Amino acid sequence: MKRNLVTLALALGIAVLLFFVLRLEKQRAAGANCRLVYWNIQNGMWDGQNDNYDRFVAWVREKQPDICVWAEAQSIYYTDSDRPMRPDEQYLVAHWSELAARYGHPYVYIGGQRDDFPQAITSTHPIDNIDRIIGNGADSVVLHGCGWAQIKFRGKRLNIVTLHLAPHQWAPGLPSDEARKASAERCEGDKYRRMEIQYICEHTVATHPEAGDEYWMMMGDFNSRSRADNAFYRYPDNDTKLYVHDYIASQTPYLDALLEKHPGEMHVTMHYPARLDYVYMTRPLLERTVECRVCHDFYTEPVRDPQQLSNFWRPSDHRPIVVDFKL
């Protein structure tokens, strides 16, 4: 009897703790009046296709964001399957306006698209396209595209750059396993991402000489590691895996929001111990950032697909990042 009471008390204690944790997750940081949610929703929120995205919509509504940025924003595979959809059967990107309206966002923007992995922005405020970037089609191809949009919020113009850098250890477009292996040994995937980030920055933030005094943010799945986390990774100082974020740190006015808000901490954004997702900001916007955190809750915790389909996870192989601003 005594053991049962102890077990019951422990269970109640855990339930109360989880209640307050989840309640805190829903609330904005004190003083914040604008919330951004960024998330790579793997394969166009494939996990949400079997319930008409009801759980996804409910989660977004709970967070009450003003701006959302979604990476991998296109439907690709049939429900509970790894069979590619026919283009005419893909719900997203064509119906993002319909889906976003369900969580209270009447405005939708799709960035530059050249394959099945574009990024989308949805918002409570109008979104203006500045540029959709896919590269020059020759020596500089931005594999998954990039978007540069502006949103005016409380009289402040926010520049938002969305991206999703190339995913593999090898360079894109190679025809055989042998060629890909040789490319990976030459670290050509890292070098390709370094080319992409330079091209993106040169065509966005670098076009504004005064960007360091403006409100800019750049976010997405960078598929690369940061030197700021290298106490955790322990890569050699000259490792090519660090190229992308070294470029951002040395050549742009951007600052790593998670690092600035939580110095010295490692914030995992994947289903394995790594941070591939980042939100970068210029100093003026960072100074108006009340909180930036990786979201951990029941819904967003990555769970391997029970069928072991490809590399599919539910609801995604990435975790969201939530940012609260006082604008």
Regions found by a protein language model. Give the residues of each.
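Short catalytic/ligand-binding loop motif for oxyanion handling, primarily in non-cytosolic enzymes
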Residues: 45-46, 76-79, 116-120, 168-171, ...
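A solvent-exposed, charged loop/short amphipathic helix patch at secondary-structure junctions
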Residues: 170-191
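Structured beta-strand-rich core segments of catalytic domains in phosphoester-bond hydrolases
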Residues: 71-170
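Soluble or luminal CAZymes and related metallo-dependent hydrolases
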Residues: 48-55, 88-92, 141-144, 185-201, ...
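N-terminal, active-site-proximal structural segment of metallo-dependent hydrolase catalytic domains
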Residues: 2-102, 113-116, 317, 324-327
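Active-site-proximal beta-strand elements of phosphoester/diester hydrolases
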Residues: 33-46, 133, 157-167, 182-186
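Metal-dependent phosphoester-hydrolase catalytic domains
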Residues: 7, 132-133, 206-217, 223-327
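Active-site beta-strand/loop signature of hydrolases that rely on acidic residues for catalysis
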Residues: 35-41, 59-86, 122, 149, ...
